[in-house]
């Protein structure tokens, strides 16, 4: 069995090596000729899976995407050809949630404006939005959720309108899929009018899709409003973001919010489980066995951490400033965006760091944030 796999997917060899011949490929430049004789195709969001890519292949048994979203896959076409498909919903939700939370802590420190006491509006209450809310609520932050689709579907959580978030939230974090038509279109959801209407000193965090914000309008509005603070992990026109926009963001990264070691391993592992199920064989590999031990064994706390100390704990796991600095130095280079993504030194999630502190009730919130070993 020939397994064609994006070269940037981790842990492919230990998981799929027993199932067939593994052929790594560049996902962004993948051609129909390369795919012609593949039995299994494993991709990420940079690969457009459609008739143009697959029309010459008449033996494909499975297409898997190690991503939350599926907007890069023509699901109708796969359905017409009866090609089984699976993605990895939620695989990197924890990573995105922690990234957004860390970014907010970094902004709070940079501008001496504590996160504690602020109101955060989350637009999109799916896997990544929910994970972001979980971090914030663990820390005691008031969260407003906006998701008209989930609200209409009967999700029991409390939702508010986008207008309410615009009026009440100090921070707005975006977590919607990209939809270009229909009642709940998200392309340019934040257009020039909505960006202009943001209340003073709003922090705007985008970890979903670049097209959700009109980037040209964002440049114009930001140049007029220095009070707005931006954290941008996604960009219109990836992998070539607007050169004028990057310097206007407080933190800028190349679509890596979901790039934790745990998240990327989880995505590959979910596809492994699905393929084994399809082939009717036992999935006898373990996700935990894939992950290396963390380079810090444990952190012993003398007191319950304040916000500054919490940021330091977060930086032990992931220092956003490093990726921001690297991105600013490389994004104008040819292939700089993709090079940084490909060579990203997969950060860890909070669960990799064990904390030792004996007053359990004072630090339950750290366990809820995801840190391990608290109070043990």
UniProtKB/Swiss-Prot annotation:
One of its GO terms (molecular function) is NAD binding. It catalyses: 4-phospho-D-erythronate + NAD(+) = (R)-3-hydroxy-2-oxo-4-phosphooxybutanoate + NADH + H(+). Pathway: Cofactor biosynthesis; pyridoxine 5'-phosphate biosynthesis; pyridoxine 5'-phosphate from D-erythrose 4-phosphate: step 2/5. It comes from the Bacteria. It is found in: Cytoplasm. Its EC number is 1.1.1.290. GO terms for cellular component: cytoplasm. Its main location: cytoplasm. Belongs to the D-isomer specific 2-hydroxyacid dehydrogenase family. PdxB subfamily. Homodimer. This is Erythronate-4-phosphate dehydrogenase. The gene is pdxB.
């Amino acid at each position: 069995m020939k397994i064609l796999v994006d070269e940037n997917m981790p842990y492919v060899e230990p998981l799929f090596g027993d199932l067939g011949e593994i052929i790594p490929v560049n996902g962004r430049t993948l051609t129909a000729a390369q795919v012609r004789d593949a039995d299994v195709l494993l991709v990420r969001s940079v690969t457009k899976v459609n008739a143009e890519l697959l029309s010459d292949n008449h033996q494909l048994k499975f297409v898997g995407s190690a991503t939350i979203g599926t907007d890069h896959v023509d699901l109708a076409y796969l359905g017409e050809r009866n090609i089984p498909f699976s993605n990895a919903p939620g695989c990197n939700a924890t990573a995105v949630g922690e990234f957004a939370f860390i970014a907010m802590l970094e902004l709070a420190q940079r501008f001496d404006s504590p996160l504690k006491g602020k109101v955060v509006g989350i637009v999109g209450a799916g896997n990544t939005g929910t994970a972001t809310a979980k971090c914030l609520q663990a820390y005691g932050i008031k969260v407003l959720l906006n998701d008209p689709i989930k609200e209409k579907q009967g999700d029991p959580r409390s939702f508010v309108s986008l207008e309410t978030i615009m009026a009440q939230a100090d921070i707005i974090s975006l977590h919607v899929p990209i939809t270009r038509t229909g009642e709940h279109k998200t392309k340019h959801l934040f257009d020039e009018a909505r960006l202009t209407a943001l209340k003073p000193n709003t922090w705007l965090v985008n970890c979903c899709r670049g097209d959700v914000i009109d980037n040209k309008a964002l440049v114009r509005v930001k140049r007029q409003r220095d009070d707005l603070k931006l954290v941008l992990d996604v960009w219109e026109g990836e992998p070539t973001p607007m050169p004028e926009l990057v310097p206007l963001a407080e933190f800028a990264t190349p679509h890596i919010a979901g790039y934790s070691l745990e998240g990327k391993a989880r995505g590959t592992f979910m596809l492994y489980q699905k393929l084994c199920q399809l082939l009717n064989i036992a999935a006898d590999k373990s996700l935990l066995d894939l992950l290396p031990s963390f380079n810090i064994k444990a952190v012993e706390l003398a007191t319950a951490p304040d916000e500054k100390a919490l940021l330091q704990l977060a930086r032990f796991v992931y220092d956003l400033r490093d990726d921001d600095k690297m991105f600013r130095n490389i994004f104008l280079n040819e292939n700089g965006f993709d090079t940084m993504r490909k060579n990203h030194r997969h950060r860890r999630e909070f669960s990799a760091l064990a904390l030792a502190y004996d007053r359990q009730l004072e630090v339950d919130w750290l366990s809820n944030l995801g840190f391990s070993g608290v109070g043990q």
